[in-house]
């Protein structure tokens, strides 16, 4: 047996489709118990690295626009840091909250709506607001 091949290759041509069966392969987020920061890939094509040392709180609520927009994502997650507030809309956010609670959430980013049915955790949108320091 060849000891150099200790892992299986993913034969799926579509990594998003493979993610439905494995939460570790979800393109919307990843978990790493050794991280000290959360990387946020915002929908404006900017990325931000936020230190867990500045984490304040997270709030998971039903999406308030569901009453007027039935096609809207069902959940809203707000992650507040000292200098930034991250807002995400999507579904299945409990796994993200659990990873955040342990400071193991490595990154978050959105994936197209067409993947929502394939993923247990789907992030439809990610926005960040940076807090300006007052001189």
Features from the language model and the residues they span:
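Phosphoinositide-dependent membrane-docking surfaces
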Residues: 49-67
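Helix-rich interaction surfaces within compact, conserved domain-sized segments
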Residues: 3, 7-8, 85-135
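A structural detector for beta-sheet-dominated domains
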Residues: 41, 61, 80-82, 89, ...
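Short aromatic-glycine motifs in intrinsically disordered, low-complexity regions
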Residues: 35-49
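Short, surface-exposed polybasic-and-hydrophobic patches located at secondary-structure transitions
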Residues: 65-95
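Short gly/pro-enriched beta-turn/loop segments at secondary-structure junctions
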Residues: 33-35, 72
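Anionic N-terminal interaction surfaces
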Residues: 1-33
